[in-house]
Amino acid sequence: MLRIADKTFESHLFTGTGKFAAPKVMVEAIRASGSQLVTLAMKRVDLRQRNDAILAPLLAAGVSLLPNTSGAKTAEEAVFAARLAREALGTHWLKLEIHPDARWLLPDPIETLKAAELLVREGFVVLPYCGADPVLCKRLEEVGCAAVMPLGAPIGSNQGLETKAMLEIIIEQATVPVVVDAGIGVPSHAAQALEMGADAVLVNTAIAVADDPVAMARAFRMAIDAGLLARQAGPGARSTQAQATSPLTGFLEALA
């Protein structure tokens, strides 16, 4: 079980809602993934309409919604979007995203920390998307974020855990859940993140753009389970030398 703030999740896989060919495919994939927490970009939905094409099926699916501030370029814009989301959706949970450069979509560390501090004071459960910077993640934790969401690689790149060395440090020093977000391209990347000690991963593009999003969602679900089980099983220590799995000479001596 995974606990973040006031909620407990059985699934360690969080999913996004962007890039799907149709809302029906999106909902089917989310169900296949087993995900219980789904991110939702505020700029993509009509908050005045509960029958919005994206919002309505998510509400019907019974998943917890995690509105995000994607599109915000400053702390002020992110705080404004967060307040709108809380009023419209009735949730104090928020994925904080601030990326001023539309080409690279890398999170702004200064604005993210500033917004996180303000939002925590206002009672939000803040899950910030951030760079794989151990110092920044610790600062976000210290100002009261309920979890940290460092990137594995740039959003939508499918490159995998390019920031593995930094993620390992973040995981080792964290006292809040670590959710690896962005760049995860195939199920094996997700399994690796869980094996490393991450508490969860968030996947969107890899599922949404697959030839069969529902099958890919199911594959990610299995990979998450495998990665978590492998970590709990206690992997053997790595060695720089070969280690024989059976005696090399004993059987020859027995025959002599």
UniProtKB/Swiss-Prot annotation:
Kindly list the positions annotated as binding 1-deoxy-D-xylulose 5-phosphate.
G156, A182, G183, N204, T205
State the top-level EC class.
Answer: transferase
In its UniProt record, which GO terms are filed under biological process? thiamine diphosphate biosynthetic process
CDD domains the record matches: ThiG
* Compartmental location: Cytoplasm
State the superkingdom. Bacteria
**Alphabetical list of InterPro entries matching this protein:** Aldolase_TIM, Thiazole_synthase_ThiG, ThiG
Q: Self-association or partners: how does it assemble?
A: Homotetramer. Forms heterodimers with either ThiH or ThiS.
Task: Report the sequence similarity comment from the record.
Answer: Belongs to the ThiG family.
Sum up the protein's function in the record's words. Answer: Catalyzes the rearrangement of 1-deoxy-D-xylulose 5-phosphate (DXP) to produce the thiazole phosphate moiety of thiamine. Sulfur is provided by the thiocarboxylate moiety of the carrier protein ThiS. In vitro, sulfur can be provided by H(2)S.
* Name this polypeptide is given: Thiazole synthase
Species for this entry: Klebsiella pneumoniae subsp. pneumoniae (strain ATCC 700721 / MGH 78578)
